[in-house]
Each structure stands twice: as structure tokens, then as C-alpha cells.
Amino acid sequence: MASILLRSCRGRAPARLPPPPRYTVPRGSPGDPAHLSCASTLGLRNCLNVPFGCCTPIHPVYTSSRGDHLGCWALRPECLRIVSRAPWTSTSVGFVAVGPQCLPVRGWHSSRPVRDDSVVEKSLKSLKDKNKKLEEGGPVYSPPAEVVVKKSLGQRVLDELKHYYHGFRLLWIDTKIAARMLWRILNGHSLTRRERRQFLRICADLFRLVPFLVFVVVPFMEFLLPVAVKLFPNMLPSTFETQSLKEERLKKELRVKLELAKFLQDTIEEMALKNKAAKGSATKDFSVFFQKIRETGERPSNEEIMRFSKLFEDELTLDNLTRPQLVALCKLLELQSIGTNNFLRFQLTMRLRSIKADDKLIAEEGVDSLNVKELQAACRARGMRALGVTEDRLRGQLKQWLDLHLHQEIPTSLLILSRAMYLPDTLSPADQLKSTLQTLPEIVAKEAQVKVAEVEGEQVDNKAKLEATLQEEAAIQQEHREKELQKRSEVAKDFEPERVVAAPQRPGTEPQPEMPDTVLQSETLKDTAPVLEGLKEEEITKEEIDILSDACSKLQEQKKSLTKEKEELELLKEDVQDYSEDLQEIKKELSKTGEEKYVEESKASKRLTKRVQQMIGQIDGLISQLEMDQQAGKLAPANGMPTGENVISVAELINAMKQVKHIPESKLTSLAAALDENKDGKVNIDDLVKVIELVDKEDVHISTSQVAEIVATLEKEEKVEEKEKAKEKAEKEVAEVKS
């Protein structure tokens, strides 16, 4: 396993978060000075207050790790950036350390691909957790029983009118947003990750509000797919250039049907189950809980904090954090803090994925199997104190982290945010989470309120759903404006050197002749110190990622490979099977309390499931037809390349990229070297496509070294995923034997 060399701990800048609005700032929150947690300040924590913008130099630490899977802790070589600050000053509360500091800027790495759980999976986890606590006799959150006051007839009529009013408003706004996004897709524009998530939720809402749309929209879409491909050729990449018109038609039909089936399955997983016995208590409990935290100042119970903290998932939290909060988290995790908001979120997302995978691997081996240096590396990667503490303290805080993340299922983003606030160590984990939730924006609370209703199977409040949709749409529009401003600034920088403006002269004045500057030899100062310059890496832009995608598509066409389509179809079948198994497990869990008859799948979900199963059969037929035609020789030959061979040489990849569009030779060479991880001169096309799809979802520019890290990470993720699948298979076999 690769050893880890943390060359220096100097200058790890603690984070600065903005104070939360409209409520009192608790101790340890970003509004107040934070206590240092470095080793040299262990005895000064109660008497020296230092703001977040500085830190104390500490001794370098050299760490190593054992086992191949811990290699994801390996950090890339640092480049120190000097940030000029004001000198040390004294204030009424003590000394404020504001001086020059060295900020280590590192590249990021990621771990196993974490797919978001569907609403059904979240409901299943919630049910299993409740039943497990009931069996073990542990604490289960149970809201106090309240006397239900029967509403008057007029109040019930008014509430029903409001419900339908907000429902029709939601239907109209969802239709407008869906039509706009669909038009963008038809015209060849790609949706960002945030836009795709919004589009997915809107489609799920439309089918929930009007279940009959499944009979109208889905068959209509399938029928018009060939027409849409003809009218809007930009829907698919322009790489379907084959010698056989039949092959071109079949492959286009296969690609579009596969994407549509995957989208419909994602829509099914976004739909919630219906619980007829639900009384809307979960939504009300969450509103009361958040009101206690934000307004009244009343402390919720530990069960409430742990229960509702699970709703603030990493994606939801990171997408709605402000820029100062994103910068603070990047500094805490020693990531690059300069760049667009999308780039910062992308870095944080990849780092959180890495931490999630590491947590599972550490828990499998056991914290006691790690030595001191490995413990320091693990704690430092999670924003916890790593120096100046005992070995028992390191093991204790790492065990507490694993318990909160893996057993209590607290999202990693909340745990990292609590470390960024540098709260006192005497606070309990529940109090730390409470202080962290106070700093989250209001939009996160709206999204979580809708999520808790979906997980519990309650009727979603149309007003809350409407507010969450409008806030998310406003955030998407703000991202578009930021991208437009960034493009304009880049264009302005390109034209700036060409502008030469002459200095104006006063009328009637004669130009003065230029006099040579004479400087005495004794006054000339020479700096003999060598100039230190960081290594400049080749940056890959979004446009070049698209070029690389086109090149891969051409190579796949030349090799007549359907490996990608087959793999995606198998994943789709697994998703359908997992969804069906989750429904069966939910009924099994509910049978323990006799409530299985009250929970059922929505009508739209049932109809979409049948349609997806039909489309899977059609896709299987298309793939079989293409393979039979290739074997019979009816389609074009594979240009001398063996069919199904997906490994190409680096030279082939460079030539393919040259044919698509001109890119500098140096960048092509460095990019190809980054993709060739084991340096054998060969690259797997399918693995390359996975990397491109991962980066293409985000509108960010990355370096070639970061591309290499993604390639290595994806291979590591596959190994971890295989271990988990093998473990699940073994558990199922044991359960079948017992039954």
C-alpha cells in the first residue's frame, strides 16, 4: 500500500462561516472567535481567543498506512500559497493572530461512487431502525400525544380550497419548468446535475398530481422518439456516422430508449409510498423541531436531533451552502479554496465520497488495527485534531465519528460542518449537531420538510413543495447568471491585451523628449535568490471534456462495441429488482405491527414500473438484433479491430482526439499519460467513458493530475463495491438457510 507523506501541517487555516441570521449565535459558532485546536495551544484554550482566519504553526508529521484500501488517504504534493495578512494586533479580548500564512493547496481524490438512496429505500431504513430499537428496547422517538381538536366545517372547506389552489399552482409551475428543460434537451444542451435532479422531481410530481399522464405521456414519448431524433439531431452526439444506415438507426433507437428507461426508473424511485394511516405528524414534528432550534431557543431532545439530522443529506446541504461556508469547508479539508462555487462543491463532494468509503473500510478492519500515524491521518482528513493528543483520544474521536456516520447515519457534511465551527470538545455530539443545524440556510429546511413527509409516507403539503421548487429554481437561475458573468469576464480578459490606450495630452503643450534614466552602480540592488515557481499543470476545460467524449464515441463505433449499453442495461435491471425487493421488505417490516394493509405503492408508480419492464424487453431485443447482424456480416466491418475489444493504446486515443478538434500536443500527451494509470500504454474505453461522465455532469475545469486521481479512484470504488455485493449475497444466503 502506498505510504502517506504529510509534508507539513503548517498553515492549515481554520474556517470562517457567516453568522446565522435572525437568531442568537451560540458559543463556538462562526460569529464568535474560536478556540485553537492545534497542539501548541493545548494549555491556552481558555485564555486565548483567535479568529478563524489564522492558525498556529505545528511540527510536521510523517504518516504511513497499511493495506491497499487505505491508499485513498494519500495526499497529493502541496504547493504553498502565501496569503498576506495584517500583523499581530491586540484587542480587548486578547491577541488576534493575523499574519502571513502558508495555505497548502492540494488536489482532491474520491472514493466509491455513492448512489443516492431512493425514497422507498429511505422508508425501509426508517422502518428497520424503528423495529430494531423496539426489539432492543432502545430509545425510540415518540412525540407527545396531543388532543386533536376537530375543525369546523368552514375551516375544513377553507383548508381543502387552499390545498387545491397550491396544487394547481404547483402543477402549472412544474409544467413550465419541465417544458423549458425538455426544450433544452431537444436542442442538444446538457443539464447540470442540479437541473437534472430538479427535472426528475418535477416529473415525479406531475405523475403524482395527475397519474393518468402515464397513459398519455410515456407512450407518446416512445412513439415520437424516431421523429424527435430526426427533427432534433443534436439530442444525440454527432458520432453516429456508420457505413450502414440500418446500424445507425438501431443504435440511435437503442441509445434513446435506454436513456428514457433509466430516467423513468429514476422517476419511480423518486415517488413516495402512500400510508393511509399517516396523520401528518412527521411534518408537524419537523416544523416544531426546527422552530425550537431557530427561534425559541428551546433545546430539542437527543432523539429528535439524531432523527431529523439524517434528512440533511450531503447533496442537499452542499448545494445550498453559501460561498463563505464552502470556502471554509475547503480550507478545513485542505482543498483548493479558489474557484467557482461549482468547483468548490465538486471538490467537497469527491472528498466526502472518499471519507464515506474510508469509514466503511476502517470499520471493517477495526479502529484498533490502526497505528498512531494512521490514526493521525484519518483524524486530520476528517477535520479533527490530530496532533498534541494522546493515542486513546485519537481512537476515541475516530470511533465516535464512525458511530455517528455508520450507525447513527448522520450525513458526513453535517459532521464536517461541526468541525469547521471548532465547537468546544465538552459539547455532546447532539449539541454539536444542534449548533450546526442553526447555520444552515432556510431553503435546506424546506427541502428537508418535504423529504420527511415522503419518507414517512404522508401526504406531501403542496404549499411546502411549491416553495421548495421555487427556491430551487431560483438557485438554478442564479447559477446560470454566474456562468454568464464568468464567460463575459473570460472574453473581456482575452480582448484586454489588444486594447492600447494612449495617454491624453493637454492642448498647446509640446511632447517632452524622453530622458534616459541614470542610476548609480552603487545604488543598484540585486536579488540573487532563486525564483520559486510552482509546477503549472495542464487544465482541461469543459469543452475539451466534450471533445474527449466524442473521441471515445468514435473509438467505440470503430470497435463495434456494445459493452456500455449492456452494462447500463444490467444496472437498470438491478435497479428494478432492488426496487421490487425493497417493497417486499417494507411489507414484511410493517407486518410486525399489523400496518402492511395501510401502505401501498402509488398508481403512477405501478404504471411506470410496467412500462419500464416493457422497455427493458425492447432494449434486449435491439441489442440481440445488433449482435446477430454483426455476426452475420450484414453490418460494416470493424476496421480490422476485434469486436468487443475495449482496450486501446495511448497513441490511438491521441489520434482520435486530434481528429475531432485541434488540441495542443502537450495537453494531449499529459492527458493521455494521466488516463494510463499503470503506465502500460493502454487505456480501457469503458473506464474512460465513466470518468468523462463523472466530470461532464459538473461545469468545472480540472487538471490532468486530477483526472489521474479520478481514474485510480474509480478502480478502487469498483473493488469496494464488489466487496459489499459479496457481503450482501452471503447475508441473503444465510437468511435463506435459516428460513
From Swiss-Prot:
GO terms for biological process: calcium export from the mitochondrion; calcium ion transport; cristae formation; inner mitochondrial membrane organization; mitochondrial calcium ion homeostasis; mitochondrial calcium ion transmembrane transport; mitochondrial potassium ion transmembrane transport; mitochondrion organization. The modification Phosphothreonine is found at T192. It is found in: Mitochondrion inner membrane. SUPFAM superfamilies: EF-hand. Keywords: Acetylation, Antiport, Calcium, Calcium transport, Coiled coil, Disease variant, Ion transport, Membrane, Metal-binding, Mitochondrion, Mitochondrion inner membrane, Neurodegeneration, Phosphoprotein, Potassium, Potassium transport, Transit peptide, Transmembrane, Transmembrane helix, Transport. Ca(2+) binds at D676, N678, D680, K682, D687. GO terms for molecular function: calcium ion binding; calcium:proton antiporter activity; ribosome binding. Residues 1-115 form a transit peptide. InterPro entries: EF-hand-dom_pair (IPR011992), EF_Hand_1_Ca_BS (IPR018247), EF_hand_dom (IPR002048), LETM1-like_RBD (IPR033122), LETM1/MDM38-like (IPR044202). Residues 116-208 are mitochondrial intermembrane. Residues 252-537 form the Letm1 RBD domain. PINK1-mediated phosphorylation at Thr-192, positively regulates its mitochondrial calcium transport activity. Changing T192A: Loss of phosphorylation by PINK1. Residues 115-136, 462-490, 537-627, 708-739 form a coiled coil. The chain crosses the membrane at residues 209-229. It catalyses: Ca(2+)(in) + 2 H(+)(out) = Ca(2+)(out) + 2 H(+)(in); K(+)(in) + H(+)(out) = K(+)(out) + H(+)(in). Changing R380P: In CONDMIM; uncertain significance; decreased function in mitochondrial potassium ion transmembrane transport; does not fully rescue defective proton/potassium exchange in letm1-deficient yeast. Residues 663-698 form the EF-hand domain. It holds the Pfam family LETM1_RBD. The modification N6-acetyllysine is found at K597. GO terms for cellular component: mitochondrial inner membrane; mitochondrion. Plays an important role in maintenance of mitochondrial morphology and in mediating either calcium or potassium/proton antiport. Mediates proton-dependent calcium efflux from mitochondrion. Also functions as an electroneutral mitochondrial proton/potassium exchanger. Crucial for the maintenance of mitochondrial tubular networks and for the assembly of the supercomplexes of the respiratory chain. Required for the maintenance of the tubular shape and cristae organization. Belongs to the LETM1 family. Homohexamer. Can form 2 complexes: a major (300 kDa) and a minor complex (500-600 kDa). Interacts with BCS1L. Interacts with GHITM. This is Mitochondrial proton/calcium exchanger protein. It comes from Homo sapiens.
